[in-house]
């Protein structure tokens, strides 16, 4: 046993230090980035924000809407092959370039993923998603899918430390998903005592990935546009959002009427709700590591997206970054004990 004495930080522990800027307006600023991926040497250009591969967020409808903002959607793995075929047949190939096909690590998942990818050459991205990216089985599956899909960009996770980021990149991942326990409907840290404050995880994992020519996704922990900006400032190449995009028209979640007010059900993918729906219940050997909440129905997602992107643009102008790529180079975080004035309630 040993204890690491270094203090690890989350988004709530810091603020950006403002700096001189030559920008006259937020409208001068571009959030579009272009990436070249390590293993395929292919390129992608767009706004590097991804809707999470949760079945109450990463829907086909969400993918269609977010593609209009040049953003990405990691479509959840629970759609059938028939549903995928209908989506591909009715969707422009350009839009499919903003879609990730999500998969688990079972043999059935592997077979299904290859069948989906065969539907269109425009489906370029694979999201290999497990709660614990530290298992040897996960690494072996990653090598297997890299060998089977040499021309596809692979996103894999989740992990929170540099040495495992390096392991995944060397095993075939182009992008590594970073985050254990920070999500709004995740209870892993409570049930297991395992986790890592998200900002420190991003900073350390970005350093490891960039040294090998890979990228990272900051997955989880963002509660407001300022947190999204902090993730980018800490070195994340992409940011994945679940709760911030939940309870919208495009989510496809269950709408519940409470005293005449519509709410939408939102739950973690390791919650009892998810396991009841997709696995026939919580297995005897495990505990639920997610919760189920009712969120006020928020209508179309486009207004929320504009608010998020507008906040990140504003951050860039405050620190003098003329494009999103420059944000991490212009970032100085200050440690704080307060974030905002809540005398009249939270924003």
Curated annotation (Swiss-Prot):
Q: Where does K(+) bind?
A: 181, 183
The enzyme's main class, written as a single word, is: oxidoreductase
PROSITE patterns (alphabetical)? IMP_DH_GMP_RED
Known Pfam families for this protein? IMPDH (PF00478)
Chain residues that bind NADP(+)? 108-131, 216-239
What does the record give as the reaction this protein catalyses? IMP + NH4(+) + NADP(+) = GMP + NADPH + 2 H(+)
How it assembles, according to the record, is:
Homotetramer.
State the function annotated in the UniProt record: Catalyzes the irreversible NADPH-dependent deamination of GMP to IMP. It functions in the conversion of nucleobase, nucleoside and nucleotide derivatives of G to A nucleotides, and in maintaining the intracellular balance of A and G nucleotides.
Q: What is this protein called?
A: GMP reductase
Give the originating organism.
Answer: Aeromonas salmonicida (strain A449)
